[in-house]
Amino acid sequence: MEDSEILSQINALTDEEHHLLHEGEQNVGLTDDQHARVSAIKVELDRLWDLLRQRRARRHAGLNPATAEERDATIVENFKQ
């Protein structure tokens, strides 16, 4: 997957997240399904940003960015920030 494809997915997920959160503001709050979807979006965004950072780091180091792999959510979600 190319950087542009990753960024496109990030943008689409961010738009969906904003749409869901806006709907929640217009109503009493998020439904259980909406809340679950927002949580899933956040995890997938973390995974995609991690993949993009890996690709950029490999490129900067003179390595092939295509060898970067999307990490499991359990790994990415446990990164310390």
Question: What name fits each language-model region?
Answer:
Residues M1-Q81:
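Extended, charge-rich alpha-helical interface modules
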